[in-house]
From Swiss-Prot:
Function, as annotated: Catalyzes the reduction of free flavins (FMN, FAD and riboflavin) by NADH. Subsequently, the reduced flavins diffuse to the large HpaB component or to other electron acceptors such as cytochrome c and Fe(3+) ion.
Binding partners and assembly: Homodimer. 4-HPA 3-monooxygenase consists of a reductase component HpaC and an oxygenase component HpaB.
Tree of life domain: Bacteria
Organism: Escherichia coli
InterPro entries: Flavin_Rdtase-like_dom, HPA_mOase_red, NADH-dep_flavin_reductase, Split_barrel_FMN-bd
Associated pathway: Aromatic compound metabolism; 4-hydroxyphenylacetate degradation; pyruvate and succinate semialdehyde from 4-hydroxyphenylacetate: step 1/7
Sequence similarity: Belongs to the non-flavoprotein flavin reductase family. HpaC subfamily.
Coiled-coil blocks: none
Induction cue: By 4-hydroxyphenylacetic acid.
Short name of any one Pfam family annotated for the protein: Flavin_Reduct
Protein name per Swiss-Prot or TrEMBL: 4-hydroxyphenylacetate 3-monooxygenase reductase component
A GO molecular-function annotation: FMN binding
Length: 170
C-alpha cells in the first residue's frame, strides 16, 4: 500500500471515531485566537492535564505558544454554529468570532464560551511535534462545568448532537 493511500485510509478510519467537539481559545500578549478541535483527551487527573493536537501548519500555533495558556471549551449540542465559525467554515473573521456576546474571561484571562458543557483553562507545559501535528500538554488550573445541555460530536465528517438517553416507559 502506498503512503498516500495509507494516509487516506487512516483518515477514513478516524472519521469513524466519534469525538467531542471543542473550541480551543487563547488570549495574551501574543494575541487572541481560537480553533475547533476534536483531537483532545485527558492525560491524568493528578495534576489535571489534557492533550490538545493542532496541525503544525496552523498560523495559530505561535499565538498559543506565545501566550502559554489556553482554554478548552467543550461544546454543547446548540453550539454547532460556533464550531463552524472556529473551523473556518463560515468565513467569519477571528476578530468577529470573539466580538459575539457569548464570551467571558476566565480566572486565567482566557476566553470562556458561555454555555459550554465544560471550560478548562490551563497552562501549556510542553509542546511536542509528532508528524503533521503539534501535541500540547496542558495542566488545567480552572474548570467551569454546566449541568445543562447535550453533547456535540464529530462523526463521519459531520456534526451530530448527542442526547441524554431517555428513561424507557414502563
Amino acid at each position: 500500500m502506498q503512503l498516500d493511500e495509507q494516509r487516506l485510509r487512516f483518515r477514513d478510519a478516524m472519521a469513524s471515531l466519534s469525538a467531542a467537539v471543542n473550541i480551543i481559545t487563547t488570549e495574551g500578549d501574543a494575541g487572541q485566537c481560537g480553533i475547533t478541535a476534536t483531537a483532545v483527551c485527558s492525560v491524568t487527573d493528578t495534576p489535571p492535564s489534557l492533550m490538545v493536537c493542532i496541525n503544525a501548519n496552523s498560523a495559530m500555533n505561535p499565538v498559543f505558544q506565545g501566550n502559554g495558556k489556553l482554554c478548552v471549551n467543550v461544546l454543547n449540542h446548540e453550539q454547532e454554529l460556533m464550531a463552524r465559525h472556529f473551523a473556518g467554515m463560515t468565513g467569519m473573521a477571528m476578530e468577529e468570532r470573539f466580538s459575539l456576546s457569548c464570551w467571558q474571561k476566565g480566572p486565567l484571562a482566557q476566553p470562556v464560551l458561555k454555555g459550554s458543557l465544560a471550560s478548562l483553562e490551563g497552562e501549556i507545559r510542553d509542546v511536542q511535534a509528532i508528524g503533521t501535528h503539534l501535541v500540547y500538554l496542558v495542566e488545567i488550573k480552572n474548570i467551569i462545568l454546566s449541568a445543562e445541555g447535550h453533547g456535540l460530536i464529530y462523526f463521519k465528517r459531520r456534526f451530530h448532537p448527542v442526547m441524554l438517553e431517555m428513561e424507557a416507559a414502563i
